[in-house]
Amino acid sequence: MKSSHLVKKDLKVVWHPCTQMKDHEKIPMIPIKSGKGVWLYDYDGVKYLDAISSWWVNLFGHSNAYINRSIKNQLSQLEHVLLAGFTHEPAIDLSERLIKLTPSKITKCFFTDNGSSSIDAAMKMSYHYWQNKKKKSKVKFIALSNSYHGETLGSLSVSNIDLYKKTYENILKETIIVESPDSYNKSENISEEKHAEIMFDKMYKTIKKNHRDVCAVIVEPLIQCAGYMRMYHHKYLELLSEACREYNIHLIADEIAVGFGRTGTMFGFQQAKITPDIICLSKGITGGYMTLSTILTTDDIYDAFYDEYEKLNAFLHSHSYTANPIACSAANATLDIFKDKDVIKKNKILSAHIRKCFESLKDHPHVSDVRQKGMVLAIELIKDKKRKVSYDWKERRGIRAYLHGLKNNVLMRPLGNVLYFMPPYVI
């Protein structure tokens, strides 16, 4: 079947995510038939380099032989069983392994099915904890400006990008927003670490003022990915962790996009040597194969729900495919590869090579910044570099770059005026 025929069929029946469908009157839809390694192949035999890991999920290449075998083996045993009142080996193994990868105070694993739902569940978990502890005034959340935590009503409430949020403001929970420590906006004469310290003063004052009413602070460690790949120094996380402990507030680390080696460590928060109260994981957890997410947390939070049934203190959050055995098997295979292939160490070498490839762009008259943390590199386009005047978003410079990439067999998905490179680790 030809790609053109599939496009016609698709546009009659499929409503695509995060897309203005009218764009496809001019912008080509790309039907993909197969994938192998870092390459995707359409129905006409044209191949595309997956430079964004298919929305940041694919870690070890498409059709990875090891993950394929793990999934096939699981398919022959058990495709699914409910996790309420039942359990299975893949879920137990995955929980144990994730807990071992995190600080010693992290002891429990709760399963959800995608990134947004894990944020919703984490918010409910924190709020419900304080209710069970009779701290009834703790009902609010603090988040950073330019943050993105998902598009369900809960996760969107703690996000701060108008493009996704503004239309729905009237039905969202009000959140306290504090200015992001984003290093892009720092003064040239100070370091990123010093900038983080200066910016944290705003967060500290907000926590001090509102702590009696706040359940948790939620942040994306080190990189605000959907927030135009803006990055900040880990010093901010150190200070934030201290403040949350001082004022008895939970710290929720949204590791959905940055976890599993993206920033140079297994998890972004580890660079600050802190222990969040709640850690949300998804995207790369299954190597890019299936939807799955987890929430890792402490005995302190778990114990607040452990009670006689009649007291109605249980955490009654669930979904039908909780800890699906096939997805858990893919996740366990992914962790096997991390261990057996020494991925974190190899990524340091690979990220240094990627940095060299893009260094020359720093001097381009329409590039204001080339920034990188681990296996994430972003290029900020600008109209006037000297005056720091950005391109009007209506010019859609990112889409121009996207189309240019397709012509050169590279699949990108720019964020406004920001191009980014976030490839599988096998590139």
Regions found by a protein language model. Give the residues of each.
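Conserved N-terminal phosphate-binding loop of PLP-dependent enzymes in the Aspartate aminotransferase
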Residues: 1-427
